[in-house]
Swiss-Prot record:
Assigned GO CC terms: cytoplasm
Protein name (Swiss-Prot/TrEMBL): tRNA (cytidine(56)-2'-O)-methyltransferase
PANTHER family: TRNA (CYTIDINE(56)-2'-O)-METHYLTRANSFERASE
Compartment(s): Cytoplasm
Function field: Specifically catalyzes the AdoMet-dependent 2'-O-ribose methylation of cytidine at position 56 in tRNAs.
Catalytic activity: cytidine(56) in tRNA + S-adenosyl-L-methionine = 2'-O-methylcytidine(56) in tRNA + S-adenosyl-L-homocysteine + H(+)
Top EC group: transferase
Length: 179
């Protein structure tokens, strides 16, 4: 089962930092790919640098039509739209996990940077809210991925990592591979 993130909208300079955080959060918490609807060289290069240093595989893709991508994905996958207006995460997460476990389908999470078109709500198998107060899509994504994976991805390490952090109570423990 693979997890992909589809980010709708990206407003250049305004969203550069938050879009990078969306991608890094996706990677750190278990997603295998992020799909943007607009090209941003800065975000792509930032993500590639992190993957190079911290290891693992994480794909960055840009598509012209999010609708086409999501519709094709839905043929063999489950689509969850993270929105403030969806069903309560506490009430529906078990159902989503069971649905994926039974069907062995991949998961596509849709998150918006701006107003999400009505079609995204209609296309999703689940419209899920992470709280009903305004907050960041990064927070919603992190909470969803952590709950979905039951915390199993929080301390992921990769064999090809050049940088590794060891949790410590009292000091900074970082291993950096020398070239």
């Amino acid at each position: 089962m693979a997890i992909e993130i589809l980010r709708l909208g990206h407003r250049g300079e305004r969203d550069k930092r938050i879009s990078t955080h969306v991608a890094l959060t996706s990677r750190a918490l278990g997603a295998e790919k992020i799909i943007f609807t607009e090209e941003d060289k800065h975000v792509k290069e930032s993500v590639e640098r992190i993957v190079e240093a911290w290891g693992g595989e994480f794909k960055f893709e840009v598509v012209k039509s999010w609708r086409s991508y999501a519709k094709r994905f839905k043929d063999n996958g489950i689509v969850v739209h993270l929105t403030m207006y969806g069903e309560n995460i506490n009430k529906i997460m078990t159902e989503i996990r069971e649905d994926i476990s039974k069907t062995n389908k991949n998961l596509l999470l849709i998150i918006g940077a701006e107003k999400v078109p009505r079609e995204a709500y209609d296309l999703a198998d689940y419209n899920l809210s992470v709280g009903n107060q305004p907050h960041s899509e990064v927070a919603a994504l992190a909470i969803f991925l952590d709950r979905f994976t039951e915390g199993k991805t929080l301390y992921s390490e990769y064999d090809d990592a050049k940088i590794k952090v060891t949790p410590s109570k009292s000091e900074k423990c970082v291993f950096v591979e020398k070239d």
